[in-house]
């Protein structure tokens, strides 16, 4: 988690709450554990952020990042076009696979989830929009780092019991603009998830890449996302 301190207490604590929720939904008690902030303060901050749409309550009552981050993120150059192009393919990928599908872009040494299509299963992978994850662990991170590898898989690598398959979304010059991923419980994905889900992921990545062809010709490159995403 980012531990940057600005000296403005309420801002620093609010960002600590946001960074904690970027790891996934959590209860008030879990927020206290993740941030080190007192229970009363963390609940007050989360409730205030909820009023502004930056935090929401998930179906089970836990706090999660709010959907306002989606509209804020879309103001970043090129990201709105990326999400618009990818969204129908994310939805199709989730429906065809029965699992959750995610779209990631690179930001420095991290990857940031910028869109999701969640599985209808009760037991499913949940990655919040705005979640910041390391590039080093998980298939999507490696797909962004090594676009020439094509299809990348992960089994219990980032989170025990979870498997994923990812592929880079390439621009016209082979630059990785983003990565698209499908993930779910190993019990359904199996320990060789590429065998069943790989073709679906590759088809989705290629379809989005084809739609984004005009972006690279207008000056958008994969590194243009680097360093411009907020840590939501």
Positions of PLM-derived features:
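Amphipathic alpha-helical effector-binding/dimerization core
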Residues: 61-149
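Juxtadomain coupling helices with adjacent low-complexity linkers
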Residues: 149-161, 178-232
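A short, hydrophobic, proline-anchored segment that marks a local hinge/packing element in signaling
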Residues: 165-173
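A structural signal for short hydrophobic beta-strand segments in well-ordered beta-sheet cores
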Residues: 55-56, 103-104, 169
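N-terminal helix-turn-helix
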Residues: 1-79, 210
């Amino acid at each position: 988690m980012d531990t940057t301190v600005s000296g403005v207490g309420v801002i620093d604590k609010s960002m600590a709450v946001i960074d904690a929720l970027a790891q996934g939904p959590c209860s008030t008690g879990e927020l206290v554990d993740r941030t080190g902030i007192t229970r009363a303060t963390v609940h007050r901050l989360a409730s205030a952020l909820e009023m502004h749409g930056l935090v929401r309550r998930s179906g089970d009552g836990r706090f999660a990042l709010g959907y306002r981050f989606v509209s804020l993120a879309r103001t970043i150059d090129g990201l709105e076009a990326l999400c618009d192009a990818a969204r129908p393919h994310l939805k199709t990928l989730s429906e065809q696979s029965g699992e959750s599908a995610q779209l990631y872009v690179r930001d420095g040494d991290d990857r940031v989830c910028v869109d999701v299509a969640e599985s209808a299963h009760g037991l499913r992978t949940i990655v919040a929009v705005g979640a910041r994850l390391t590039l080093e662990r998980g298939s999507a991170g490696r797909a962004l780092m090594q676009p020439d590898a094509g299809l990348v898989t992960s089994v219990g690598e980032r989170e025990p019991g979870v498997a994923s398959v990812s592929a880079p979304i390439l621009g016209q010059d082979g630059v990785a603009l983003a990565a698209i991923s499908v993930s779910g419980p190993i019990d359904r994905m199996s320990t060789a998830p590429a065998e069943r889900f790989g073709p679906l992921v590759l088809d989705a990545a290629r379809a989005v890449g084809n739609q984004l062809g005009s972006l690279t010709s207008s000056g958008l490159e994969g590194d243009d996302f680097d360093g411009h995403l907020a840590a939501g």
